[in-house]
Amino acid sequence: MAVEKFETALKKLEEVVKKLEGGELSLEDSLKAFEEGIKQAAFCSKKLNEAEKRVEVLLKQKDGRFITEQFQPEDE
């Protein structure tokens, strides 16, 4: 199975939302679309969590040098 990219999964999720909001799907098709949407949302959430762990903030020191620190969200 090919590795899916975040952007691809997000686009699929947006398409599912559009279909569901359209109100044209049968109950069965709505459930299938909802299930696919949950799958794509979970994938996107996982990828965002992985990215957050990798983000580094570049800080400029008074002497002009730059250092890196691990990203710390404000709520931590």
Swiss-Prot record:
Keyword Cytoplasm: yes
Pfam families: Exonuc_VII_S (PF02609)
Record's keyword terms, sorted: Cytoplasm, Exonuclease, Hydrolase, Nuclease
EC nos: 3.1.11.6
Molecular function as annotated in GO: exodeoxyribonuclease VII activity
Entry-linked InterPro entries: Exonuc_VII_S, Exonuc_VII_ssu_sf
Localization per Swiss-Prot or TrEMBL: Cytoplasm
Superkingdom of the organism of origin: Bacteria
Catalysed reactions, semicolon-separated: Exonucleolytic cleavage in either 5'- to 3'- or 3'- to 5'-direction to yield nucleoside 5'-phosphates
GO cellular component, one term: cytosol
Role: Bidirectionally degrades single-stranded DNA into large acid-insoluble oligonucleotides, which are then degraded further into small acid-soluble oligonucleotides.
Subunit structure: Heterooligomer composed of large and small subunits.
Protein name from the UniProt record: Exodeoxyribonuclease 7 small subunit
Originating organism: Geotalea daltonii (strain DSM 22248 / JCM 15807 / FRC-32)
